[in-house]
Curated annotation (Swiss-Prot):
UniProt record, GO biological process: D-xylose metabolic process; xylulose metabolic process
Transmembrane regions: none
Organism: Aspergillus niger (strain ATCC MYA-4892 / CBS 513.88 / FGSC A1513)
Protein keywords: ATP-binding, Carbohydrate metabolism, Cytoplasm, Kinase, Nucleotide-binding, Transferase, Xylose metabolism
SUPFAM superfamilies reported in the protein's UniProt record: Actin-like ATPase domain
Biological function: Highly specific D-xylulose kinase which participates in the catabolism of xylose. Xylose is a major component of hemicelluloses such as xylan. Most fungi utilize D-xylose via three enzymatic reactions, xylose reductase (XR), xylitol dehydrogenase (XDH), and xylulokinase, to form xylulose 5-phosphate, which enters pentose phosphate pathway.
Catalytic activity: D-xylulose + ATP = D-xylulose 5-phosphate + ADP + H(+)
Induction of synthesis: By D-xylose, L-arabinose or L-arabitol.
InterPro entries recorded: ATPase_NBD, D-XK_euk, FGGY_C, FGGY_N
Name recorded for this polypeptide: Probable D-xylulose kinase A
Residues reported in the UniProt entry to bind ATP: W364, G469, G470, N473
Cellular location(s): Cytoplasm
Organism taxonomic ancestry: Eukaryota, Fungi, Dikarya, Ascomycota, Pezizomycotina
One GO cellular component, as annotated: cytosol
Length: 570
């Protein structure tokens, strides 16, 4: 007899994954459905359809129904006993919206266990497509959202972010303008996360307290939809109608939404007591893939760079994102997204290899050696200026700049900043400088969100977790620790591409097994086998070095402002 099991679903752009864990957080089954490889009847590419003329990127909702049929069938083939599943949660690609038709509730309630979901729910939607996060068709709407409360800073303060093309509010606004009749016939609007929960509940599920913050509609401090923004978004159909479409949002991320629909009991043998828990967004689910304590930081070093932190401080800014924490009241999730990450580092790596001319043992060996041999900020002596630079092979959003490279010399003693005048030994000085540049930007933008981890230690993260391709690189890890700190060190987190599904499954475990008032971090922290998932790869806080990089961060901020001024952006 196996103990209780929990499923976390991850509905991303290119696949649906169902990951099953037991109470001890051990993964016991995984079933995947790759949209391009496994689906039939949809002319998709990389999971989406595009209308380039209008910059639209979207997915057919029926594809996701086919995928859920496929994932559950996959678990059945692996011999999983569905009657052991006690709780289900999920993670959905953030910001995407699903438009339900007037007969949606009826169709969800009357599912026939002898047929697939796709056969029966194809007609449940007023609009067959869901906008994808890559969609950029809403510039006009974003401009209106940014202006609605007085400016980008005001919108960010209210909703956690300035307006973004992919955010659900601007998308709904464009939808009601482009398809006014379809909008009127839309009974409910779900996020991708609450869509997953709705399928299992057999009726429309409420949105999740964290994922609702990715809409530009939820006033985070008030804990309610922002009336002015609803008014802007709703157009002539009015605020009350839009409120009905969106529904109420429960405060508790672990609330029991209700039992699984009888369709799944009859078709797969789920227990009628299996409980559905609110599904959250893919980014909030990522911080649930480990017991991330307040002030811990997670840096994803992939093609782009993403920085996630759990913090009690709410200090929004147009360049960053704040969300309610998906499980823990009083905490927020802070997020930074950069377009330039791995590619920028690889270009410097290639230049170093070319200059040296010899074939290194691994492609990163020379880059690492040069990075570690170069002193912090290229200062061989205290009297030397700090070498600071920006390296953007792609246009950047943080700060908002064109692609390009800029190099400066900064003197922390008098605060003077000069464009570099041939003092750089290119490309060797750039190896360390590019890692410093990326990490200083993270430090600059997360200051004020951390606390002191102990007597006499400056405010910084307790731990810095690195994930993604760049986390394998010891030199990057060492520089990350010197700049970001981390009183307990820098760790490599090995959860592969399962982070979102794991986070969703852990959320279900916590929601079903928590004691009264027990936090997610406490319950998961006691059961998480950290030695299986993390390895300490570098020291964090080093007295003296950390403070020196604090001076560099001031120079870095001056440099960004100077470049923005030069480019006519400030």
């Amino acid at each position: 007899m196996q103990g209780p099991l929990y499923i976390g679903f991850d509905l991303s752009t290119q696949q649906l994954k169902g990951l099953v864990v037991n109470s001890d957080l051990k993964v016991v089954y995984v079933s995947k459905f790759d949209f391009d490889a496994d689906s039939h009847g949809f002319p998709i590419k990389k999971g989406v359809l595009t209308n380039e003329a209008e910059h639209e990127v979207f997915a057919p909702v029926a594809l996701w129904l086919q995928a859920l049929d496929g994932v559950l069938e996959g678990l059945r083939k692996q011999g999983m006993d569905f009657s052991q599943i006690k709780g289900i949660s999920g993670a959905g690609q953030q910001h995407g919206s699903v438009y339900w038709g007037e007969n949606a509730e009826k169709l969800l309630k009357e599912l026939d266990a002898s047929k697939t979901l796709e056969e029966q729910l194809d007609g449940a939607f007023s609009h067959p497509f869901s906008p994808n996060w890559q969609d950029s068709s809403t510039q006009k709407e974003c401009d209106e959202f940014d202006a609605a409360l007085g400016g980008q800073s005001e919108l960010a303060f209210a909703t956690g972010s300035k307006a973004h093309h992919r955010f659900t509010g601007p998308q709904i606004m464009r939808f009601q303008r482009k398809y006014p009749d379809v909008y009127k016939k839309t009974s409910r609007i779900s996020l991708v996360s609450s869509f997953i929960a709705s399928l299992f509940l057999g009726h429309i599920a409420p949105m999740d307290i964290s994922d609702v913050c990715g809409m530009n509609l939820w006033n985070i401090k008030k804990g309610a939809y922002d009336e002015k923004l609803l008014q802007l978004c709703a157009g002539s159909s009015g605020v009350d109608d839009l409120k009905r479409k969106l529904g109420d949002v429960p405060e508790d991320g672990g609330i029991h939404l209700g039992p699984i629909d009888r369709y799944y009991v009859e078709r797969y043998g789920f227990s009628p007591d299996c409980t559905i828990i609110p599904a959250t967004g893919d980014n909030p689910a990522t911080i649930l893939a480990l017991p991330l304590r307040a002030s811990d930081a997670m840096v994803s070093l992939g093609t782009s760079t993403t920085f996630l932190m759990s913090t009690p401080s709410y200090k929004p800014d147009p360049a960053t994102h704040f969300f309610n924490h998906p499980t823990t009241a009083g905490l927020y999730m802070f997020m930074l997204c950069y377009k330039n990450g791995g590619l920028a580092r690889e270009l410097v790596r290639d230049a170093v290899n070319e200059k040296l001319g010899e074939k290194p043992s691994t492609s990163w060996a020379n880059f690492d050696k040069v990075t570690l041999e170069t002193p912090p900020m290229g200062q061989k002596a205290d009297s030397d200026p700090m070498k600071l630079g920006l390296f953007f092979p792609r246009p950047e959003i943080v700060p908002n700049l064109r692609s390009g490279q800029w190099r400066f010399d900064y003197n922390p003693k008098d605060g003077s900043l000069q464009p570099s005048n041939g003092g750089w030994d290119e490309p060797f000085d750039e190896a360390r400088a590019i890692v410093e540049s990326q990490m200083l930007s993270l430090r600059l933008r997360s200051r004020g969100l951390t606390q002191s981890p102990g007597e006499g230690i400056p405010a910084q993260p307790r731990r810095v977790y690195l994930v993604g391709g760049g986390s394998k690189n010891k030199a990057i890890a060492k520089v990350a620790g010197e700049i970001l700190g981390g009183s307990e060190g820098v760790y490599k987190l090995e959860i592969g591409d399962n982070a979102c599904a794991l986070g969703a499954a852990y959320k279900a475990v916590w929601a079903m097994e928590r004691a009264e008032g027990q936090t997610f971090e406490d319950l998961i922290g006691k059961r998480w086998h950290e030695e299986e998932f993390i390895e300490k790869i570098a020291d964090g806080y080093q007295p003296g070095v950390f403070e020196r990089y604090g001076q560099a961060a001031e120079g870095f901020e001056k440099m960004e402002l100077e470049v923005l001024r030069q480019e006519g952006k400030h």
